[in-house]
Amino acid sequence: IDRIFETGVRLDNFYANSSVSSPSRAALLTGRFPAMVGVPGVIRPSVDQNWGYFDPSAVTMPEVLKNGGYRTALIGKWHLGWESPNLPNERGFDHFHGFLADMMDDYYTHRRQGGNYMYLNDKEIDPKGHATELFTSWSVDYIKKEAKEKNPFFLYLAYNAPHSPLQPPVEWVNKVQERDKSLPVKRARLIALIEHLDYNIGKVIPVSYTHL
């Protein structure tokens, strides 16, 4: 993550006007204040807990890039709508492989309140494995495929981690606890979830450099 900060583009005048998921994503994808595109708060399927509706007329970054000849992909978490016209493939992404909803109740089953929100484009899927590792693997495969076909492409990779639940692979928790046995279990799990995420980002970066 530090390497991305040091070598990438720093948006040092970017404000999402919110500390939560949906508005931040709306701001990132449109370059506008989230409330101006209908997302002042978290988008949820239940009316009494919903705080937004992504304006279908808002122009998104992948739409602009797509018009410029880029292939566009979202791998990972969407959280800007559950139904048409606010599905990833309808908002500028040629390829979607990931999670539609707000959070996972389990990083291995990928369920949210009993529902399955894992999709490959418009098809529900039920992959096996930790979500962070799945998103990494799918991203690596996507980069290699587009590079092989010599397509200019844009990949928006959005992990669920380190969002709760604090569910890193056990071996990563063990590493943290071996370094500092005084850590509370919850703290150790959070550190492990972040380190596991960082490790997986580190698997994507070399592939992108190699194939650009």
Tell me what each language-model feature is.
Residues I1-L212:
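Formylglycine-dependent sulfatase
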